[in-house]
């Protein structure tokens, strides 16, 4: 790996904002090899694109998919990220919950402990809540 890649590089490249940094980020992504993209940075990038740039969910998902597929970028588990994006986009969960669903699906656990009833929209995992006393 040549370097871990930070959210600000991805956001500049994806948004073109501000233009000078965006050009530098895009050139860097095109010229480097084996940049490691970790899941936490993906989550933060989703948050920034949604909150600051008010990008629609479909655009955010497409942008992250393009980063996962980018030639110079390496992900620890690209299939997990892609499934997280699918759940995020189609089941309309926050990215963190979508990521938990994808983790539960790819393990033998199959359950997510959460008060967030939106997880119930995904029929591949079971949501459990802490019991009332």
Each language-model region and where it sits:
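Short, conserved active-site loops that position catalytic residues or coordinate cofactors/metal ions
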Residues: 39-47
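Active-site neighborhoods of divalent-metal-dependent phosphate/nucleic-acid chemistry enzymes
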Residues: 72-113
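Short, well-structured N-terminal submotif of metal-dependent ribonuclease cores
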Residues: 1-37, 52-59, 131-133
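Residues that scaffold the ATP/ADP-binding catalytic core of kinase and kinase-like folds
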Residues: 12-14, 48, 122
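Acidic, PIN/NYN-like endoribonuclease modules and their adjacent C-terminal/linker elements
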Residues: 1, 101-133
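Acidic active-site catalytic centers that drive phospho-/nucleotidyl reactions
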Residues: 6, 44, 97, 116
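Active-site-proximal, substrate-binding regions of enzyme catalytic domains
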Residues: 46, 50-53, 57-66
């Amino acid at each position: 790996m040549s370097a871990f890649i930070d959210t600000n590089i991805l956001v500049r490249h994806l948004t073109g904002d501000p233009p000078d940094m965006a050009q530098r980020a895009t050139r860097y992504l095109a010229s480097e090899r084996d940049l490691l993209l970790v899941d936490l940075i993906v989550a933060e990038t989703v948050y920034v694109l949604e909150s600051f740039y008010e990008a629609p969910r479909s655009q955010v998902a497409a942008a992250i998919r393009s980063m996962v597929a980018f030639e110079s970028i390496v992900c620890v588990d690209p299939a997990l990220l892609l499934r997280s994006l699918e759940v995020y986009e189609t089941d309309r969960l926050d990215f963190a919950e979508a990521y938990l669903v994808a983790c539960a699906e790819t393990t033998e656990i199959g359950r997510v402990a959460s008060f967030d009833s939106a997880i119930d929209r995904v029929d591949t995992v079971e949501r459990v809540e802490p019991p009332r006393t």
